[in-house]
């Protein structure tokens, strides 16, 4: 299996790095932690920039990507100091696709 990143993956991660730099500074995360609140502005920025439904089918407004791409995004968010719970929904995309229905 070839694990080299595609051009699309590199562009996706470049965009994510720029987003993290703008919306998820270390000071911002510390402030959220001190206030005992989740970083909702960062979550909103992820959604507004197309990362919220990454891995979901286009039919539900998502951007279909493979598991390797999802893992690269998760890894980059963590590497850059982002909140791990920002990734929670990404872990369940495969289960939703496999076991979910249109009605749900």
Task: Give, region by region, the residue ranges found by the protein language model.
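Intrinsic disorder at enzyme termini
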Residues: 1-8
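A non-catalytic, amphipathic alpha-helix used as a structural packing/dimerization or gating element
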Residues: 8-19
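A generic secondary-structure micro-motif detector
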Residues: 6, 31-33, 63, 98
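N-terminal capping segment at the start of a domain
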Residues: 18-30
């Amino acid at each position: 299996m070839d694990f080299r990143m595609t051009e699309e993956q590199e562009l996706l991660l470049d965009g994510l790095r720029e987003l993290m730099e703008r919306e998820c500074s270390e000071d911002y995360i510390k402030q959220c932690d001190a206030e005992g609140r989740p970083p909702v502005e960062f979550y909103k920025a992820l959604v507004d920039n197309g990362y919220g439904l990454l891995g979901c089918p286009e039919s539900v407004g998502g951007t279909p990507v493979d598991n390797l791409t999802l893992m690269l995004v998760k890894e980059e968010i963590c590497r850059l100091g982002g909140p791990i719970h920002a990734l929670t929904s990404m872990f369940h995309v495969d289960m939703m696709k496999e076991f979910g229905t249109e009605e749900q």
